[in-house]
C-alpha cells in the first residue's frame, strides 16, 4: 500500500512536470520534482519507524492474518516464543540448523513479544490497523502510540479510593487532635476546673488518688491521675460544639460519600414535607422550624448556630426573626449598635486619629 502511494505520488509529480511550459524551466523544475518525490517516499517509508513492530507488520511477525482471533494470536505467540526463547541458546554457541544464534533469537523473541503485546489489546490493535490503512497520518500514529505507552497503568478508581481513604484518616485524626486540644484548654479554665473538682469529690474519685500504705504513690503520679479525672469529667459533662466538637466516624469524607444518596433522599423527603405542611396546608411553624428559618436568615451553619447560648436563641424567637422583615430590622439595629460601640471604643478612636494624622506607612523606592 505504501508502494502504491509512492507510485501515485510519483505519477502525480510526473504529470505536473509534463504540464509545465517552457523548455528553459524544465531542468530547474525537474530538480524540484525529484526532491519532492524523495522527501515523500522517505516519509512514507518511515511511517512505522520506532512504532510497534518497526518496519515489519506485526501480523506477519506472528504469521497470522488481520482477521485472526485472540486465540489464534495467543497460540502463534506461544509457539514462536518457545522457538526463539533465548534460554534455548547458549552464549557463544555456533548457529544451529536454522541459522539462529543467541543474539538473533533474542532479537526475534523481542519482536514476537512486541507483536503480541500490540495485537492482544483491542484498543491498541485498532490503532495499529488504522495505521496500516492510513500510513500518511504520521503524527497521529506517534501520538496514539506514545499516549498509550506513557498512560498510567493503575486503575483510576483505585487511585481515587486510596486518596479518599487517606483524606478520611487524616480528617479523623486531626479532628481528634482538635478535640483533645479543646479539652486540655477547658481543663485549665478555672470555672470548669472547679466544677469538675466538685463533681469528682461528690463521686469519691479524688479519694482514691490519696491511698496510703503499700499503694501509696508519689505526688507526680497523684497529680497526673487527678488531671486525668478532671479531663474525663469535662469530656462527659461539657458538650463542645463547632470545629472542636467530638469527632464522629460518619462525618469523615469516606462515609459522607457512601451516605450521599441517603442524604439526598432525606433532604428531598424533608423538602416535600415542608412544602406540603406549611405552603399547601398552611400550618404554623414549630419551634424547630422557626430556629431553622432564623439560622437561614443569619446565613449560619448548623455547627455555628449550635454554639449560640440558649438565651440568645430564645431572644431570637421572641423577636420573631424567622420573619424576613423582622430580621432585616434586627440586622440594621445590630449594625447601628456596632457603629456606636466602635465610635465609643478608645482603641478605635486612637486608630482613627492615627489614620487621620499619619495614615498607613508607604513603601517607596526613591533615594533619600
Curated annotation (Swiss-Prot):
Entry's transmembrane regions: 25-47, 158-178, 252-272
Organism listed in the record: Xenopus tropicalis (Western clawed frog)
Keywords: Chaperone, Membrane, Transmembrane, Transmembrane helix
SUPFAM superfamilies documented for this protein: Chaperone J-domain
Keyword Thylakoid attached: no
UniProt family annotation: Belongs to the DNAJC25 family.
InterPro entries linked: DnaJ_domain, DNAJC25-like, J_dom_sf
Domain of life: Eukaryota
CDD domains reported in the protein's UniProt record: DnaJ
Localisation: Membrane
Protein name per its UniProtKB record: DnaJ homolog subfamily C member 25
Membrane topology: Multi-pass membrane protein
Domain J: 57-132
Pfam families xref list: DnaJ
Gene Ontology biological-process annotations: protein folding
PROSITE patterns in UniProt: DNAJ_2
Gene Ontology CC terms: membrane
Gene3D superfamilies the UniProt entry points to: DnaJ domain
Amino acid at each position: 500500500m505504501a508502494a502504491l502511494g509512492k507510485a501515485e505520488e510519483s505519477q502525480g509529480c510526473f504529470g505536473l512536470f509534463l504540464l509545465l511550459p517552457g523548455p528553459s524551466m524544465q531542468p530547474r523544475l525537474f530538480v524540484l520534482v525529484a526532491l519532492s518525490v524523495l522527501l515523500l517516499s522517505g516519509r512514507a517509508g518511515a511511517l512505522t519507524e520506532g512504532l510497534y513492530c518497526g518496519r515489519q507488520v506485526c501480523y506477519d511477525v506472528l504469521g497470522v492474518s488481520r482477521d485472526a482471533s485472540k486465540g489464534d494470536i495467543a497460540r502463534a505467540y506461544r509457539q514462536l516464543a518457545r522457538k526463539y526463547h533465548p534460554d534455548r541458546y547458549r552464549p557463544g554457541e555456533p548457529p544451529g540448523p536454522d541459522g539462529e544464534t543467541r543474539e538473533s533469537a533474542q532479537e526475534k523473541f523481542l519482536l514476537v513479544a512486541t507483536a503480541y503485546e500490540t495485537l492482544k489489546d483491542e484498543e491498541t490493535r485498532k490503532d495499529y490497523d488504522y495505521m496500516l490503512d492510513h500510513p500518511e497520518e504520521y503524527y497521529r500514529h506517534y501520538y496514539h502510540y506514545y499516549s498509550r505507552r506513557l498512560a498510567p497503568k493503575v486503575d483510576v478508581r483505585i487511585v481515587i479510593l486510596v486518596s479518599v481513604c487517606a483524606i478520611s484518616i487524616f480528617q479523623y485524626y486531626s479532628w481528634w487532635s482538635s478535640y483533645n486540644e479543646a479539652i486540655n484548654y477547658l481543663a485549665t479554665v478555672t470555672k470548669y476546673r472547679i466544677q469538675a473538682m466538685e463533681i469528682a469529690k461528690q463521686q469519691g474519685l479524688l479519694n482514691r488518688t490519696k491511698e496510703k500504705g503499700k499503694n501509696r504513690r508519689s505526688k507526680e503520679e497523684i497529680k497526673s491521675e487527678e488531671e486525668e479525672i478532671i479531663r474525663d469529667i469535662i469530656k462527659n459533662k461539657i458538650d463542645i460544639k463547632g470545629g472542636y466538637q467530638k469527632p464522629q466516624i460518619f462525618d469523615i469524607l469516606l462515609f459522607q460519600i457512601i451516605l450521599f444518596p441517603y442524604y439526598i433522599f432525606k433532604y428531598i423527603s424533608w423538602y416535600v414535607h415542608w412544602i406540603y405542611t406549611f405552603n399547601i396546608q398552611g400550618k404554623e411553624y414549630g419551634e424547630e422550624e422557626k430556629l431553622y428559618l432564623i439560622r437561614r436568615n443569619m446565613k449560619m451553619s448548623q455547627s455555628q448556630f449550635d454554639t449560640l447560648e440558649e438565651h440568645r436563641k430564645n431572644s431570637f424567637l421572641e423577636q420573631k426573626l424567622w420573619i424576613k422583615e423582622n430580621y432585616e430590622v434586627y440586622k440594621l439595629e445590630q449594625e447601628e449598635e456596632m457603629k456606636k460601640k466602635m465610635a465609643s471604643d478608645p482603641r478605635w478612636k486612637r486608630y482613627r486619629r492615627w489614620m487621620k494624622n499619619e495614615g498607613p506607612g508607604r513603601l517607596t523606592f526613591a533615594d533619600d
